[in-house]
A protein has these predicted regions:
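Flavin (primarily FAD) cofactor-binding/catalytic cores of flavoenzymes
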Residues: 1-254
């Protein structure tokens, strides 16, 4: 991640830097959301409720939940903070490190042996520039269609230029033969939720696809009623036998 790269540069893993600038489009260097109930976004029950929502609501939720997958781990943030504190407050070294949130790099120009970066501040619309010998991009991945699909594209229904329309069972909507299907994973975050690019539900996704391919439930995907009722009308109560599994007694010995 960008945080790991910054920490490596700060520690001189590639040699001591005269100056380090960490530019981020986010308004702060936010922590990964690892709250207990945030983990519930990565469950089949949540996906079931998410997929039936209106498109604008789904986009809103994805924005709200972004830090559950894209945030910086608490350990990394604390390590960076301690490194900076020790360097500048304890050792009193020159402040040659800058953290620059709320900025986008709009232009990258060759400047002698290095580079000149032009930046725009999102909040006050100010414009800045800086020069650097080395520029490291930590901007993630760009969505792209597989190169094997061009001949099939006229038959595939698209949501937009780079997004397929994916059904609940991970089949693509298309006008090809009904007995044939194209399955897609990591291609439907807009309809299947923030967990779709993650490995946490790989076993469940794979089982659902195999059940669909086989035309029978080889894998039992039934689940007890969820503790969190994500949608209105979810009135199922926890089953007594399921509750009994969590009953326990405590013995205290002194």
């Amino acid at each position: 991640s960008g945080a790991d790269l910054f920490l490596n540069a700060l520690r001189g893993e590639w040699g001591e830097a005269a100056e380090i600038n960490w530019v981020s489009r986010r308004n702060n260097f936010n922590a990964l959301d690892e709250a207990a109930f945030a983990d519930e976004y990565f469950t089949p029950e949540y996906i079931s409720g998410f997929s039936g929502l209106k498109e604008d609501i789904r986009h809103q939720l994805l924005d709200e939940q972004k830090m559950t997958s894209d945030g910086i781990t608490a350990d990394s943030l604390l390590t960076i903070y301690r490194e900076l504190y020790h360097r500048f407050e304890v050792l009193r070294k020159p402040r040659n490190i800058r953290l620059l949130p709320s900025r986008s790099v709009t232009t990258l120009e060759s400047s002698g042996p290095g580079w000149k970066l032009l930046m725009e501040h999102h909040l006050d619309r100010g414009r800045e520039s800086l020069e650097s010998d080395v520029v490291i991009f930590a901007t993630g991945y760009r969505s792209a269609l597989p190169q094997i699909l061009p001949s099939l594209m006229p038959l595939i229904t698209m949501h937009d230029k780079n997004t397929f329309k994916v059904r609940d069972d991970f089949t693509l909507e298309w006008s090809g033969p009904k007995e044939n299907n194209i399955f897609a994973v990591n291609a439907s975050m807009q309809t299947h939720g923030i967990a779709e690019p993650q490995l946490s539900l790989m076993a469940w996704r794979s089982a659902r696809i195999l059940n669909r391919v086989l035309g029978r439930d080889l894998f039992d995907l039934s689940m007890p009623p969820a503790l969190i009722q994500w949608r209105s009308g979810s009135r199922k109560k926890p089953q007594p036998e399921a509750a009994a599994l969590t009953h326990y007694t405590t013995n205290i010995q002194e």
